Regions:
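N-terminal helix-loop segment corresponding to the beta1-alpha1 unit
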Residues: 1-185, 189-195, 375, 379-390
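Flexible, small-/acidic-enriched active-site or ligand-binding loops
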Residues: 2, 345-390
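Glycine-rich beta-alpha junction loops
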Residues: 40, 133-134, 206-211, 248-250, ...
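Short Gly/Pro-enriched turn/cap motifs at secondary-structure boundaries
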Residues: 57-58, 66, 231-236, 241-242, ...
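Conserved Rossmann-fold dehydrogenase catalytic segment
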Residues: 135, 163-173, 194-210, 229-236, ...
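Oxidoreductase and adenylate-handling cofactor-binding alpha/beta cores
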Residues: 179-199, 212-224, 265-272
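Aromatic-enriched alpha-helical interface/lid elements that frame and gate functional surfaces
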Residues: 239-315, 319
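Conserved PLP cofactor-binding pocket of PLP-dependent enzymes
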Residues: 313-337
Length: 390
């Protein structure tokens, strides 16, 4: 099938992660994404290793980090400091449907490449700015990074054990969510352009996105006025829904209703816990969380993990293992869903560059570009020819 975004032209003036992530998702969906990189050095993340992808000549062709967010793009080197470079970028913008940038607020204005400067000559352009704090407000001028957003957006205070320190989530979630929300905003703006014929400005921010995904914890506070506390691997609103010890490791048990709780107790041979009126519903189980979890944990700790999971599965109780990353990519479900990519590359010593596809399937088509991440300036001559600048 033709890719959903085939024919869409995207100009990416972004580096690091949030902006490039948005560009990669659009590329996976079929857009032609041109990544404009600083002459000589390119995206900073090209050097964020090890590990690096080894090239055919023994030198590396970019860090694993860079390759995680730049699949499917074409790269052109450009010097924004020169008038010639700025002219080329403006020419590329004029033929693009979407522009993504993640400079600090006002950072592109000095080059005449901000939305206000480009809009008159590119009236149909969807211009998306990705920043730490957004285009306005008391923090707008500050630089923003994922770790800061996780902290300032409340996620770190909610993550970790109750008696431990606030904890960063193990992936750059604020960057990634902002990239995904940017794609949502861009697609909404493109739909609006079909109606009006005009482009528009999309403003996304790391802290905004982090606050947005506080989800139930945000509403727990806004409704009750009580500040949520860290509860480790448990759930703020559901009991039992957490990690339990087993005789040989740990298992996740995620009961979502009273019936599943009763089945969990039956698997453990603890009918008395299922019948106890203090635990008959989630309100009671929340009230008596500490005592109940202590009793359940003592029982799960006697069972081997796989035996517990097998019995829970047979009873229809949601449960699962805690996988490390190697186990993730060896998991039969992940393999079946073809999440891992191996993209042919003449530049890589192994002949291919690995990746992880965008998790969208449309009528059986899995969203993924066939093109690996580009070498710095790999497509400069090709792109210049396309705009009559060769």
């Amino acid at each position: 099938m033709p890719k959903p975004l085939a024919g869409l032209r995207v100009l990416e003036l972004a580096r690091i992660l949030a902006g490039p992530w948005a560009g990669q998702v659009l590329a996976d969906l079929g857009a032609d994404v041109i990544k404009v990189e600083r002459k000589g050095t390119g995206d900073d993340t090209r050097g964020w290793g090890p590990p690096f992808v080894e090239g055919v000549d023994g030198n590396h062709i970019g860090s694993a980090y860079f390759h995680s967010a730049n699949r499917g793009k074409r790269s052109i080197e450009m010097d924004f400091e020169s008038e010639e470079g700025r002219r080329i970028v403006r020419k590329l913008a004029a033929r693009s449907d979407v522009l993504i940038e993640n400079f600090k607020v006002g950072g592109l204005a000095k080059f005449g490449l901000d939305y206000k400067s480009l809009a008159p000559e590119c009236p149909r352009l969807i211009y998306c700015s990705v920043t730490g704090f957004g285009q306005d407000g008391p923090y707008a001028k500050r630089a923003g990074y994922d770790l800061m957003a996780q902290g300032m957006g409340g996620v770190m205070d909610l993550t970790g054990m109750p008696d431990g320190e606030p904890t960063r989530i193990g992936i750059p979630m604020s960057d990634i969510f902002t990239g995904v929300y940017s794609v949502v905003g861009i697609l909404a703006a493109l739909n609006e352009r079909q109606r009006t014929g005009k482009g528009c400005y999309v403003d996304t921010a790391l802290v905004d996105s982090t606050v947005a995904v506080l989800s139930n914890q945000a509403l727990n506070y806004l409704v009750s006025g009580k500040v949520p506390k860290r509860i480790g691997n448990a759930h703020a609103n559901i009991v039992p829904y957490q990690v339990f010890p087993t005789a040989d490791g740990y298992a996740i048990v995620a009961t979502g209703n009273d019936n599943q709780y009763v089945k969990f107790c039956n698997v453990l041979g603890a009918a008395e816990l299922a019948q106890n009126p203090e635990y008959k519903d989630n309100v009671g189980r929340l009230k008596h969380r500490e005592v109940l979890i202590g009793k359940l944990s003592a029982l799960t700790a006697r069972m081997k993990r796989d035996d517990l999971l097998e019995k829970l599965e047979a009873q229809g109780v949601p449960a699962g293992p805690i996988n490390d990353v190697e186990q993730v990519f060896n998991d039969p479900q992940v393999i079946h869903r073809a999440m891992k990519l191996d993209l042919p590359s003449d530049a890589a010593r192994s002949g291919s560059i690995p990746g992880v596809r965008t998790p969208i399937i449309i009528d059986g088509w899995r969203a993924a570009s066939e093109r690996p991440s580009p070498r710095l300036g790999e497509h400069s001559a090709e792109i210049l020819r396309e705009i009559g600048e060769a």
